[in-house]
């Protein structure tokens, strides 16, 4: 994946969090003052508005000239397309590797919706602990202004560092487990968001670029499946208690870092071969 593509997905990721920031605050306020039914109704209404905006704006979307050229070229077989087809199993294998590693990462990251809220309620005695979730989109938007969001010097290094960053976030909680200071929680969100910014846009770009364009939707579905599996794992860990979840997440992050470091050891060679076949 190119640096430009990584920056494009970083902007998409930041745009999503533009909506996440106010929604976490408004949702928590509605739940606290009017109850869960009103909060869920507001979320449903906002979703309908988003779908309506998408449908209205859909008519303005037009296929780009590059898409038309790509369709025309794909109609005629060539040595390049045959070479790319021969690489298909290896590329789908790399997609699977990325999604497995991402699932391990998301098990830890999605603790922000479970374990971190329990931690805030028990340690900080907050009436609306959901408000701390706004720290995540806020950090995403701030980090989007830094070179970190578009940095792609080494793919494997970036993915490993993402796991290390969120692992450090849980290590920070272990250090401050007997403290009631909100700074520990803020530190967790900052480190976890650094990991998210390193991995999420790059991962989306990689799974899309590794497969033919006609299979991009399927590859993205696998990526989102890894997010869903991570959320399920986060829920299971949260049910075991804060202490268990924090320690287990730290171990999972270590496993994810090792997974990326080992499984992507031939990543450079593979991407080099793919570029040669596309020249």
Task: Please provide the spans of the model-predicted regions.
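Transmembrane alpha-helices of Major Facilitator/SLC transporters
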Residues: 129-152, 162-170
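Alpha-helical transmembrane segments of multi-pass secondary-active solute transporters
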Residues: 8, 38-43, 158, 219, ...
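C-terminal transmembrane helical hairpin of 12-TM major facilitator-type secondary transporters
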Residues: 159-199
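Intracellular loop-helix junctions on the cytosolic face of multi-pass helical membrane proteins
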Residues: 2-6, 10, 22, 27-127, ...
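Small-residue-rich segments within alpha-helical transmembrane domains of MFS-like 12-TM solute carriers
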Residues: 21, 110, 193-201
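Intracellular juxtamembrane helix-capping segments at the cytosolic ends
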Residues: 1, 197-212
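Glycine-rich segments within core transmembrane alpha-helices of 12-TM secondary carriers
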Residues: 6-32, 44-50, 133-137, 220-235
